[in-house]
Amino acid sequence: MAERELYPDGEQRRRIMDFIMAAGQSLLENGAEVFRVEQTMEIMAASFHLREFHVYVLTNGIFASAGTAEMSEVRNVPTRTTHLGRVAAVNQLSRQIASGEVDTIDEAETRLAQARCIPFPKDWVQIAAGMGGAFCFALIFGGDLKAGLAAAAAGVAASAYLLFCGRHGVGGGFKTISTASLITLICILSCHLLRTEASHAIIGTLMILTPGIAFTMGIRDFVQGDYLSGTIRMIDALLIAASIAIGTGLVLGAYSMLTGVVLA
């Protein structure tokens, strides 16, 4: 701890500030709650004796200052994913910094870089998860085994398509609308071949797109008193839900126009 107290102003303070901002960005863009991002950054600042540190976090940005407003920094966080392994690694790093186990900024920067490089699960694991989730949801919503198999096929296609979109920078509403359309189309075709109702398969597979995390974290932000972040997350959830409805409705409408059959 003595080494921390001897940190000079200037370049070393800037390094500490940049490190704390990078840690906060890593937490926010990988699915951490807003109040936990603020709390973790404040703990790191206090542990490294960065005086007069103040931080304000939104769902897509971080604002922080240190000293008598001599240092300030803003970071935009436009994209958010969910990688709880990275969140856990950064949280563990903050605890080790607070306890003195990690007591230099050099070691802290190295550990943070390692945490940010933790890979996502392999493609086949994500595809298998999508397949299993769609199959189980189809059965939960009243579908038979055939509907579950149709949902599993759609889940595989949807998961593979989402991975493709992630690698090629396709995001926003278009990704959700096109994925929902793909799911609906595959479920209709699969259920036609298997001679079973498509509604349960469609609903079950669409569940893998539902914005459960955004909705839940929005409610949590409201409970914590952060109404702005809560509103942003709730709007995100509503937009995703609307995109799912649009994508599904387009395919169902086209199917009804071409065949004259309205799926219940």
Task: Please report, for each region that a protein language model flagged, where it lies by residue.
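Soluble N-terminal domains of membrane-associated systems
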Residues: M1-V102
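Generic detector of multi-pass transmembrane helix bundles and their immediately adjacent loops
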Residues: S190-A264
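Cytosolic regulatory modules rich in charged/polar residues
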Residues: F35, E107-P121, G173-F174, S199-G204
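N-terminal charge/polar-biased segments
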Residues: M1-I16, I118, I246-A264
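Core alpha-helical transmembrane segments of integral membrane proteins
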Residues: P119-S199
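Alpha-helical transmembrane segments and their cytosolic membrane-interface
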Residues: T79-A147, D236-A245
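C-terminal ends of transmembrane helices
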Residues: Q114-A115, A158-G171, T216-S229
